[in-house]
Amino acid sequence: MAGHSQFKNIMHRKGRQDAQKSKLFSKLAREITVAAKLGAPDPAMNARLRSAIIAARQENMPKDNIERAIKKAIGSDGDNYDEMRYEGYGPGGVAVIVEALTDNRNRAASDIRSYFTKSGGNLGETGSVAFMFDHTGLIEYDAGVASADDVLDAAIEAGADDVLSSDTGHEVYASHDTFREVAKALEAKFGEARKAALIWKPQNTVPVDDETGEKLLKLIDLLNEHDDVQNVYANFEISDALMAKMGG
C-alpha cells in the first residue's frame, strides 16, 4: 500500500506548501463561492458546497470567512471563475492532472504550461492523461469514528465501491454518480466526514527514481503555489525516504 499512501500524501502537499494561511483560505473561499454560485447557497441542498465547507473547516477557516464567500456568490459584483482542467506529463513521463478556478484563462494556461516546460515535462490536451485516472468520490473519516468492519458494512450498504481502513482513518471510495448519496448515508450514520470530495485517483502508479521524484514533487509544489490551482494529481510512486525528505 506504499503507493496509495504516497498518493494521499501528494494530494495533501497543498496544505503544507501554502505557508501562509491567507493563500490557502483564498483558495478555499474561491471553491465555496463557485460551488454556491453553481447551485443553491444552502449546503443542505448543495452537495458540492457542503464538501467545500467541510474542507474549509478542516483547515480551521473562520466561520465569517465561509459565510462571506457564500454571500459573494449571491451578490452580482462577485468575480466569475472558470473551472479548468489541465493535463500533461511531468518529468519521467508521469501523468499529471491540474484542477483550477481562474478569472483569466489565458494567464492560467500560460503559467501552468511554463511550469510543465521548466520541469522537463509538457502540457497536453484535455483528455490526454485523464484515462489513466478514475474520477471518483473520496469520503474520509477519522479512525476512531467506528471499527473497520462497521465502516465497511455501512459503506457496502450505502453503495460504495471500496473501503481502506488503517490506523490513520477510513477512506471510502464511491463512483462519480453515487458519491453524493454514499456521503449522505455515511454522514447520517457517522456524522460529518473530515473530507468528502471528487478526486482523480490513479489507476496505477509508476515507480520513479529519487532524482525524477524530486523534480516531480517540485513541480507539484510549484503548481500548488499558483493562486488559481485548486488540486494536483499524479500517478507516480517514490521512496518513503524521499517523501520524508521533501516534507511529504
Swiss-Prot record:
GO terms for molecular function: DNA binding. The keyword Membrane does not apply. GO terms for biological process: regulation of DNA-templated transcription. Residues 1-21 are annotated as: Disordered. Pfam families: TACO1_YebC_N (PF20772), Transcrip_reg (PF01709). InterPro entries: Integrase-like_N (IPR017856), TACO1_YebC-like_2nd/3rd_dom (IPR048300), TACO1_YebC_N (IPR049083), Transcrip_reg_TACO1-like (IPR002876), Transcrip_reg_TACO1-like_dom3 (IPR026564), YebC-like (IPR029072). It comes from the Bacteria. SUPFAM superfamilies: YebC-like. It is found in: Cytoplasm. The keyword Electron transport does not apply. Keywords: Cytoplasm, DNA-binding, Transcription, Transcription regulation. GO terms for cellular component: cytosol. Its main location: cytoplasm. NCBIfam families: PRK00110.1, PRK12378.1, YebC/PmpR family DNA-binding transcriptional regulator. Belongs to the TACO1 family. This is Probable transcriptional regulatory protein RPE_4771. It comes from Rhodopseudomonas palustris (strain BisA53).
